[in-house]
Amino acid sequence: MSYLTILLGIILVNNYVLAQFLGICPFLGVSKKLDSAVGMGIAVIFVMVLATAATWPIMKVLDIFGIGYLQTIVFILIIAALVQFVEMALKKFIPSLHKALGVFLPLITTNCAVLGVCITNIDEKYTYLESLVNSFGAGVGFLLAMVIFSGMRAKIDDNPAVPKAFQGSPIVLVTAALLSLAFMGFGGLV
């Protein structure tokens, strides 16, 4: 499988947020402001690629020792450690982004999209490089979904044209569903 096919497939066709419905919590929670959405997306890309770089070889070691059943626990521990590293780096080098992300930054630890991409790389039997490309593409797809949705929310949040019964969470969920449907149009691309 070519790297371009993997990238296009995971960004547009099998987008973790819009097609596989993983990572919904930060998708809905951090998409109110564009700068926070971009910051979260970049942090997720970074964590996904680092998590894949660490978990892929560790899974090979787990398989050698016949303890592959520990995969999920080990992956969660690795992801948690990486998120702590990212949080410390952001706090030191980009404090404004650290403050903007707030409670959602530690939630990357429990972002099922990060764990999902690590497990998918193993399940799909990707090589190490294919796994890195897939995780990068998954992060870019997450960022793309966040940026598009953030732009949509800027138009609908506090919009007086939205009926009272739909204001707040209902219109946000309807908008997310419509965005997901729009991405289904890429289904035959790859």
Question: Which stretches of residues belong to each language-model region?
Answer:
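Generic transmembrane alpha-helix signature in multi-pass membrane proteins
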Residues: 21-29, 88-93, 103-107, 112-125
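Juxtamembrane transmembrane-helix termini in multi-pass membrane transport proteins
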Residues: 8-43
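Structural signature of hydrophobic alpha-helical transmembrane segments
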Residues: 3-18, 66-81, 133-145
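Ordered, amphipathic secondary-structure segments that act as subunit-interaction surfaces
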Residues: 57-102
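Interfacial loop-to-transmembrane junctions
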Residues: 154-173
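Hydrophobic core segments of alpha-helical transmembrane domains in multi-pass membrane transport
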Residues: 6, 13, 44, 49, ...
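Helix-coil boundary and interhelical linker segments in multi-pass alpha-helical membrane proteins
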Residues: 1-5, 57-70, 119-132, 187-190
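Cytoplasmic-side transmembrane-helix entry/capping segments in multi-pass membrane proteins
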Residues: 35-46, 70-75, 97-109, 164-170
